Amino acid sequence: MTEGSWERARRILAAAGLPPDRLARCRPLDGGTYNTVEELLLTDGTRHVLKVPPPRTAPGMRHERELLVSEAEFYRSAATVDVPSPRVVATGDRHLLMTACPGQSWNGTLTPDEQSALRAELGGLVARLHQVTGPGFGYPSGALGPLAPDWRTAFTTMYDAVLDDARRYRAWLPRPVDEVARTARAAYDALEEVTTPRLVHFDLWPGNILVDRPEGTPRIGGLIDGERMFWGDPLADFVSLALLGDIEDDTAFLSGYRKAGGRADFDPAARRRLALYRSYLYLIMLIETVPRAVGDDDAAWTRKVVAPQLVAALDDIGRHGAGRSKG
């Protein structure tokens, strides 16, 4: 912890109406790849989490501007349907202060029965998230402009922005950028089936799912890191929920999701949309290695593991039938 971090934390606590003298510890948290994340422990044992974005001049992808605006929107929305997540304490131009959720990131110490029960519980929570509707489609941060009146307009804007980032950073991709654009465009008509903007977290990999054991039995303690959220097609959440895999293989999750009222139909049009969303996430994972300036080993791992998934998603777009794209 630096002296600057300590003083910044005290200043933000004071602005939030919390006595800064109650700050007992300020320590960095692992896992953040864009924002600085710190845990603030108060003298009464209360834990808060503080997020601070990088300088505005730092390299990044277009959709990453004002991520904390989107994150606060996610937590406020999740609270309306009683999904465990951080509570927003205070927001500012350059910070987000929130409560800390109990538990540790989902890991490999769970038994198969515990895994199955938690996946079913997670399915129910995600179904509740998808009940929340928004005022329009897209990123509420305004990073790519105002919310759009329809999903096709919003998602094609999101996709084009990522491809523009690939060109701008000269990022390596397993297929040429223009070919990726043409392939995706062939499935854009399937987006027109989505008519209601729903809450999508879009980053629900195990690292962002906290597991708590309040009475010995594991329960989900919180869904965190909602900074990638957008208003759109709930089907898009299935990508990170089955990162580098296939959500249709996760029978426990789908059972819990459907039992809680979630709709999970995998007809050809849905599979085309899902392939689009998979390609979108895997493009981001490949492209962001450039502005993040990750090391050679991390870049090589991403190419080895993620690039084949991007190719498979693009192939699936064609496999599930090309639509009557209008561009």
Predicted segments, located by residue:
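Flexible, glycine- and charge-enriched loops at secondary-structure boundaries
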Residues: 2, 61-68, 111-119, 243, ...
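An alpha-helical support segment within catalytic cores of ATP-dependent transferases
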Residues: 4-21, 102, 112, 116-120, ...
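Short, surface-exposed alpha-helical segments at coil->helix boundaries
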Residues: 6-10, 69-72, 251-254
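ATP-binding pocket architecture of kinase catalytic cores
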Residues: 26-156, 160-161, 168-171
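Helix-rich C-terminal or lid/interface subdomains of diverse kinases
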Residues: 29, 34, 121, 160-161, ...
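Active-site acidic catalytic loop and adjacent metal/ATP-binding pocket
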Residues: 30, 35-41, 49-50, 88, ...
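Short strand-connecting beta-turns/loops that link adjacent beta-strands
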Residues: 43-45, 93, 214-217, 279-282
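Short beta-strand segments
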Residues: 49-52, 89-90, 138-141, 199-202, ...
